[in-house]
């Protein structure tokens, strides 16, 4: 396949975040892309629309902070002209220091981008076997891969998939929020006051925890164990770890002074704007597997949400992922088939934007391979390079678990820096310097 030209068709399976990004990047390079998306014919347990790059869990890409690891990942993606990032800013809604989006506007933008690109052919069909698609190919089918294709992949790799469960938080009608109790503010008054905050005193919190414990839960079917990713942990699982866990997690009150009392309450439930019109808010960090009726009953105990109208209730679904350090090469191609690439959450990254970045990287790696260029990965010191290392380092294979971007993935400084803030600033400076020099 060394004589492949720019006219060679590339198959991308899955029009989620990673697949859409990868397809657009390859198409921009002049390649003809055939993009498969099954949701016109077969829906997943979590998706609600047929649009591309649908956001099924949170509506946030995480921090934009200049000295945060997620912020650095976005800085690098912007330098590489990420289509997903551009669309996110076009669909941006107020979310403090995070990049929040109107999920419908965002998906509509991405769908139009993909459908209108002259080098992309869309096929609304279900791919059931790796043998059905020509190479080169990119599999970006996500954690909710069709069962038949998942079985084909299992046979290809010769071992079982790994899996974990994650959960989706409810969305509330803004008009049903009691603004005499809930107030708008960002933590420590940073930002423009984009979050509604629902306060609880100690007695209210304790009763709330008791009702979460009593509530009927939806248990996953057909599995003996239930592993949850830490970043999408259901609140009832957190409560099982101890009654105060929520107070030090999604309900931490520090930096949120209740205007009625002048000090921060015992606990706080935060609501983040979910659409551009500001008519819908999601419950931050409130992923849940409680039964629907129980969610309504328990969440209406929250001060400010006594009469809450739920536009969407929380749910749970299973996520599949490959043991990438064991089964994938550094360029995210299969060790069993060098022209079969993988991108997105199925590679073991966790998070919308991390998934996007793997799609962006695969587009560069595939381009290098098609042009017979040496493999040129992003520098190890960069956020992109650190994320890639986390999912391809063979030493991680035995205990591999999904990861999102964080400072622990970046290499330590050559000279130890005791000050945590300065240490992070120096790591960011190094990452930016090496990315400025990288020419993929």
Swiss-Prot record:
The keyword Thylakoid does not apply. It is found in: Cytoplasm. Keywords: Cytoplasm, FAD, Flavoprotein, Methyltransferase, NAD, NADP, Transferase, tRNA processing. Gene3D superfamilies: FAD/NAD(P)-binding domain (3.50.50.60). Pfam families: GIDA. One of its GO terms (molecular function) is flavin adenine dinucleotide binding. FAD binds at residues 14-19. It comes from the Bacteria. One of its GO terms (biological process) is tRNA wobble uridine modification. It is an enzyme of class 2 (transferase). Its cofactor is FAD. It catalyses: uridine(54) in tRNA + (6R)-5,10-methylene-5,6,7,8-tetrahydrofolate + NADH + H(+) = 5-methyluridine(54) in tRNA + (6S)-5,6,7,8-tetrahydrofolate + NAD(+); uridine(54) in tRNA + (6R)-5,10-methylene-5,6,7,8-tetrahydrofolate + NADPH + H(+) = 5-methyluridine(54) in tRNA + (6S)-5,6,7,8-tetrahydrofolate + NADP(+). GO terms for cellular component: cytosol. Its EC number is 2.1.1.74. The keyword Nucleotide-binding does not apply. Catalyzes the folate-dependent formation of 5-methyl-uridine at position 54 (M-5-U54) in all tRNAs. Belongs to the MnmG family. TrmFO subfamily. HAMAP family: TrmFO. PANTHER family: GLUCOSE INHIBITED DIVISION PROTEIN A, METHYLENETETRAHYDROFOLATE--TRNA-(URACIL-5-)-METHYLTRANSFERASE TRMFO. This is Methylenetetrahydrofolate--tRNA-(uracil-5-)-methyltransferase TrmFO. It comes from Bdellovibrio bacteriovorus (strain ATCC 15356 / DSM 50701 / NCIMB 9529 / HD100).
């Amino acid at each position: 396949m060394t004589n492949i030209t720019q006219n060679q068709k590339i198959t991308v399976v899955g029009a989620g975040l990673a697949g859409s990004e990868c397809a657009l990047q390859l198409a921009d390079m002049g390649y003809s892309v055939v993009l498969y998306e099954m949701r016109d014919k077969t829906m997943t347990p979590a998706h609600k629309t047929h649009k591309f790059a649908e956001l099924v869990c949170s509506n946030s890409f995480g921090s934009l902070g200049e000295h945060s690891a997620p912020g650095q990942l976005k800085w690098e993606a912007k330098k590489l002209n990420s289509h997903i990032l551009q669309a996110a800013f076009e669909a941006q809604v107020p979310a403090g220091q995070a990049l929040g989006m109107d999920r419908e506007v965002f998906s509509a933008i991405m769908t139009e981008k993909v459908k209108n690109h002259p080098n992309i052919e869309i096929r609304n069909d279900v791919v059931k076997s790796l043998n059905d698609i020509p190479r080169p190919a990119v599999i970006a089918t996500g954690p909710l891969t069709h069962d038949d294709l998942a079985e084909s992949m299992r046979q290809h790799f010769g071992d079982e998939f790994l899996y974990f469960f994650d959960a989706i938080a409810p969305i509330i009608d803004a008009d049903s929020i009691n603004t005499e109790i809930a107030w708008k503010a960002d933590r420590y008054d940073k930002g423009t006051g984009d979050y509604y905050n629902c306060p609880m005193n100690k007695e209210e919190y304790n009763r709330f925890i008791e009702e979460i414990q009593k509530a009927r839960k939806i248990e996953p079917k057909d599995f003996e164990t239930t592993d949850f990713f830490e970043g999408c942990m259901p609140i009832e699982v957190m409560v099982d770890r101890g009654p105060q866990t929520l107070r030090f997690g999604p309900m931490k009150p520090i930096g949120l002074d209740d205007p009625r009392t002048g000090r921060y309450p015992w606990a706080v439930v935060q609501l983040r704007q979910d659409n551009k019109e500001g008519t819908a808010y999601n419950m931050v960090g409130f992923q849940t597997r409680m039964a629907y009726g129980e969610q309504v009953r328990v969440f209406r105990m929250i001060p400010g949400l006594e009469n809450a109208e739920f536009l969407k209730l929380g749910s749970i679904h299973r996520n599949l992922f490959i043991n990438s350090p064991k089964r994938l090469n550094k360029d995210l191609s299969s060790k069993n088939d060098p022209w079969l690439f993988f991108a997105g959450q199925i590679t073991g990254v966790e998070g919308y934007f991390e998934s996007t970045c793997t799609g962006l990287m695969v587009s560069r790696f595939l381009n290098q391979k098609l042009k017979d260029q040496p493999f040129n990965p992003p520098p190890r010191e960069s956020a992109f390079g650190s994320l890639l290392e986390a999912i391809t380092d063979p030493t991680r294979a035995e205990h591999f678990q999904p990861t999102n971007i964080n400072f622990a993935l970046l290499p330590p400084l050559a000279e130890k820096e005791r000050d945590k803030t300065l240490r992070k600033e120096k790591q960011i400076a190094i990452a930016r310097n090496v990315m400025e020099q990288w020419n993929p």
